[in-house]
Amino acid sequence: MNQTLHIENVVLGGGEAGKYLAWDLAQEGRPVVVIERALIGGSCPNIACLPSKNVIRSAKVADLVSRAASYGVRTEGATVDMTGVRQRKREMVDGMMAIHRRKFAVPHLEFLLAEGLLVGPRTVEARLAEGGSRRFVADRLFLNLGTRATIPGIPGLADARPLTHVEALELDRLPSHLIVIGGGYVGVEFAQAFRRFGTQVTVLEFGTQLPQPPESGPWASAPVAHNSRT
């Protein structure tokens, strides 16, 4: 391990909030180290927001093709190739990673792919993915630790080896039947996408209606439920 280095700012976690904070600090000429364990740029461009929208776009095209005859276009024999859907998604993620690497490679900013551990007051040890470690004492330490998918404690569910959104985005074949537990926006967008690909889908929602964002009002559940069936 090298000697402990003093630095003005350390951001633990390079996800959505942390990366923009780090970029702004660096632009102001204020030294900052970003320590990220695995996903450059966080969940959104790697395993969540953007990849899911990429897959949803493919599903929208599949749905349009399935209704092409109503537009006077014949598309007999068209099929969904999930390997191709996944490859398109992966290429988008690779492109986003290239963009993030460039944005992190700026003056006053150092990006470390490492596991960060708090080992003392405002002191972080970065265990580097490539081996070795470094230690920093920061004037300001920002925690941007993010979230992770969890499996609810439903009896027997863990034994069924369920998928989270992370694994669902990596499927290379269509399941004959997909059960989605939870009718929130993530569950519904996956449900509709796979239905449009041709999978039979069942959504299990614990409430009496599909949840809706507070700003949308109670009127949103009915049209969302209707559109999810198409």
List the predicted regions and their residue ranges.
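Conserved hydrophobic packing residues within short motifs/helices of P-loop NTPase cores
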Residues: 10-12, 33, 143, 179, ...
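Glycine-rich flavin
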Residues: 2-7, 24-30, 35-174, 207-211, ...
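N-terminal Rossmann-like FAD-binding beta1-loop-alpha1 element of flavoenzymes
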Residues: 8-34, 186-196
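Beta1/beta-strand and adjacent pyrophosphate-binding region of the FAD-binding site
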Residues: 2-15, 174-184
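Rossmann-like NAD(P)H-binding beta-loop-alpha module
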Residues: 172-214
